From Swiss-Prot:
Protein family (similarity comment): Belongs to the heat shock protein 70 family.
Positions of the UniProt region annotated as Disordered: 532-561, 603-637
Domain of life: Bacteria
PANTHER family: HEAT SHOCK PROTEIN 70KDA
Membrane-spanning intervals of the chain: none
Molecular-function GO term, any one: unfolded protein binding
Induction: By stress conditions e.g. heat shock.
Protein name: Chaperone protein DnaK
Keywords: ATP-binding, Chaperone, Nucleotide-binding, Phosphoprotein, Stress response
Length: 637
């Protein structure tokens, strides 16, 4: 069996590591560097360049030099972030036929996974050059807050690169593996703060040691998949452009060549300001007008940079609070804070994190290499090279189905350890219902329509039976990569239908973040909606059972007893169509009051011989959740 390599496929830089003699080793690429820029260039003569060679020629070929592609994976073209990136990226972002964000390279539309595959090929070749043998298997890392679509796209990129992706693992979890593997004994709870080139994650992880076996259990995760070093660079670029326009009256935004030079200079200045208090951005011959060539020379202080990006750093603090709350912990419960990602080298970031946790982050973890090292460790675990290590990761958002009244019924809640499988029995909402539509949704809201529709499928061939009698078992199964499989089975006939949620119907990060924000902001309206639906269901049940008793009574019940019941039923059915909970409750009560004669009649009939059947029916009813499945048009698929 060959080596399973570990790859950190980053927004700005990528890194590859292997297990060598029981230790993780980060490999140097052909240029002699331990990290490779995640930059791909397509030259005029048809050559594809990856890494440093692509970065070096970017100034002369800005429109065909692609970077930060990870920010586009799993995104729709119309996403707010994509539209914002279009304005600042020198290359062309276009809409695909399915609405995804793709790229235009020399007139050809290319999907982000195809471009990311070029970086993965470079990582694969680096490992093969070191090992002297073919490499076909890898563990690849993704941000913890990546959704199903983004995880699928990463696996696709691996497949395009000729790799069998044995496992997708979360970046903070990988960093925890790198940190915790060689540490001493004892149980610890750590916070991994991962601010990379394009994404931000926070994970709270518990490391337990029992009889020599280490368990890495993720307690909670949170993040922002559109926050990273690229955003910090953009603030610096915009500042330099504004200063130059103030000085020279020329807007450099319209000059791709100048913008590419500015991007390089801004990134370099940002890095220098992590160790220096001031730096000069000096770009001679940046542009020209009728009066001759123009030179850019601007002094930037660390204080100025900090004022430009302060809100970005602050944006990373809220997810820390949510993650701690979800884990049921306080700041004092955290033993160690680990910083991952190149952007965490910025002193302001380190200071904010230290201020929040009340302790200095550890300095013995390499922020650029820790994730790749952890991926290699996981590869070693899968290959049997590394013993006594167990990794327990989580799913970032709740998953469920739409049930009666448009409610989302969760089968798997957020921060559940994966892989996981959960089943629940539902039933029909109508008598003799022969088919149901299973509508799968993801998110934290109570109303199914407020969450993301992941997909739907039909289960038909259900045998005729009164409502609430058929037993339909719905099973959600999330694999170790965080990818969802759903099945529905009619327990009576044994008929089953399955679906794997495809990448095209995954969530994009804006939707994830919006769901979490909405769930917090709308907790009260969600509670009221849930109460209204429960009352509606009670009213529906009362109307259904009363109508059934009326029909069974037939002419045996006098007309003067029937008339008020019929009137009360009509009023209740009208109220059920409205949104007034108190009105529905009043009409249920009114129906109960006028139905006393009917109930007495039903009890007499039951005493006459129907008691056994009714008891059996009630028992079956108790074992099922009343649910309604109705076809929902999924316009976002």
């Amino acid at each position: 069996m060959g080596k399973i390599i570990g790859i950190d496929l980053g927004t700005t830089n990528s890194c590859v590591a292997i297990m060598d003699g029981g230790k993780a080793r980060v490999l140097e690429n052909a240029e002699g560097d331990r990290t490779t820029p995640s930059i791909i260039a397509y030259t005029q003569d048809g050559e594809t360049l990856v890494g440093q060679p692509a970065k070096r020629q970017a100034v002369t070929n800005p429109q065909n030099t692609l970077f930060a592609i990870k920010r586009l994976i799993g995104r729709r073209f119309q996403d707010e972030e994509v539209q914002r990136d279009i304005k600042i990226m020198p290359f062309k972002i276009v809409g695909a036929d399915n609405g995804d964000a793709w790229l235009d390279v020399k007139g050809q539309r290319v999907a982000p996974p195809q471009i990311s595959a070029e970086v993965l090929k470079k990582m694969k070749k680096t490992a093969e050059d070191y090992l002297g043998e073919a490499v076909t298997e890898a563990v690849i890392t993704v941000p913890a807050y990546f959704n199903d679509a983004q995880r699928q796209a990463t696996k696709d990129a691996g497949r395009i690169a000729g790799l069998d992706v044995k496992r997708i693992i979360n970046e903070p979890t990988a960093a925890a593996l790198a940190y915790g593997l060689d540490k001493g004994q004892g149980n610890r709870t750590i916070a991994v703060y991962d601010l990379g080139g394009g994404t931000f994650d926070i994970s709270i992880i518990e490391i337990d040691e029992v009889d020599g076996e280490k368990t890495f259990e993720v307690l909670a995760t949170n993040g922002d998949t559109h926050l990273g070093g690229e955003d910090f660079d953009s603030r610096m670029i915009n500042y330099l452009v504004a200063e130059f326009k103030k000085d020279q009256g020329i807007d450099l935004h319209n000059d791709p060549l100048a913008m590419q030079r500015l991007k390089e200079a801004a990134e370099k200045a940002k890095i220098e300001l992590s160790s220096a208090q001031q730096t000069d951005v000096n770009l001679p011959y940046i542009t020209a007008d009728a009066t001759g060539p123009k030179h850019l020379n601007i002094k930037v202080t660390r204080a100025k940079l900090e004022s430009l990006v302060e809100d970005l750093v602050t944006r990373s603090i809220d997810p820390l609070k949510v993650a701690l709350q979800d884990a049921g912990l306080s700041v004092s419960d955290i033993n160690d804070v680990i910083l991952v990602g190149g952007q965490t080298r910025m002193p302001m970031v380190q200071a904010k994190v230290a201020e929040f946790f009340g302790k200095e982050p550890r300095k013995d973890v390499n922020p650029d290499e820790a994730v790749a090292v952890g991926a290699a460790v996981q590869g070693g675990v899968l290959a049997g090279e590394v013993k006594d290590v167990l990794l327990l990761d989580v799913t970032p958002l709740s998953l469920g189905i739409e049930t009666m009244g448009g409610v989302m019924t969760s089968l798997i809640t957020k921060n559940t350890t994966i892989p996981t499988k959960h089943s629940q029995v539902f039933s029909t909402a109508e008598d003799n219902q022969s088919a149901v539509t299973i509508h799968v949704v993801q998110g934290e809201r109570k109303r199914a329509a407020d969450n993301k529709s992941l997909g739907q499928f039909n289960l038909d061939g259900i045998q005729n039976a009164p409502r609430g009698m058929p037993q339909i078992e719905v099973t959600f199964d999330i694999d170790a990569d965080g990818i969802l499989h759903v099945s529905a089975k009619d327990k009576n006939s044994g008929k089953e239908q399955k679906i794997t949620i495809k990448a095209s119907s995954g969530l994009n990060d804006e939707e994830i973040e919006k769901m979490v924000r909405d769930a917090e902001a709308n907790a009260e309206s969600d509670r009221k909606f849930e109460e209204l639906v429960q009352t509606r269901n009670q009213g529906d049940q009362a109307a259904h059972s009363t109508r059934k008793q009326l029909d069974e009574a037939g002419d045996k019940l006098p007309a003067e007893d029937k008339a008020p019941i019929e009137a009360a039923l009509t009023e209740l059915n009208t109220a059920l169509k409205g949104e007034d909970k108190a009105e529905i409750e009043a009409k249920i009560q009114a129906l109960m009051e006028v139905s006393t004669k009917l109930m007495e009649f039903a009890q007499q009939q039951q005493a006459a011989g129907g008691a056994a059947d009714a008891a059996e029916g009630a028992k079956k009813d108790d074992d099922v959740v009343d649910a309604e499945f109705e076809e929902v048009k999924d316009s976002k698929k």
